[in-house]
Regions:
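Basic, Lys/Arg-enriched alpha-helical interface segments
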Residues: 1-37, 52-54, 62, 67-87
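Short, surface-exposed coil-to-beta transition loops
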Residues: 39-44
């Protein structure tokens, strides 16, 4: 699945990703890299600004390097989402 296909799918269903607890509206979704299988998937953190129908890609990481965001990372991204929402 190419990144362009991933973007198209997310545009069709921008609330597909799971809401991150205490994340201020940020979401996490898994994206499989081409020819890598499940072990080659990455997690993408994004924010969907409903009023303007804009999706901001905020952060990406491989599951093999990190299981979840730390509390401090969530706090930083929550602050960013708040700023983006107020634009």
């Amino acid at each position: 699945e190419s990144y362009k296909d991933f973007q198209r799918q997310l545009l069709l269903n921008p609330e597909k990703g799971d809401l991150i607890k205490d994340g201020g509206g940020i979401r996490k979704i898994r994206w499989n890299l081409e020819n890598k299988g499940k072990s080659g998937s990455i997690r993408i953190i994004y924010f969907y600004k409903i009023q303007k129908e804009i999706i901001y890609m905020l952060y990406a990481y491989t599951k093999s390097n990190k299981a979840n965001l730390s509390d401090s990372e969530t706090k930083i991204l929550r602050t960013l989402a708040k700023e983006l929402n107020n634009e």
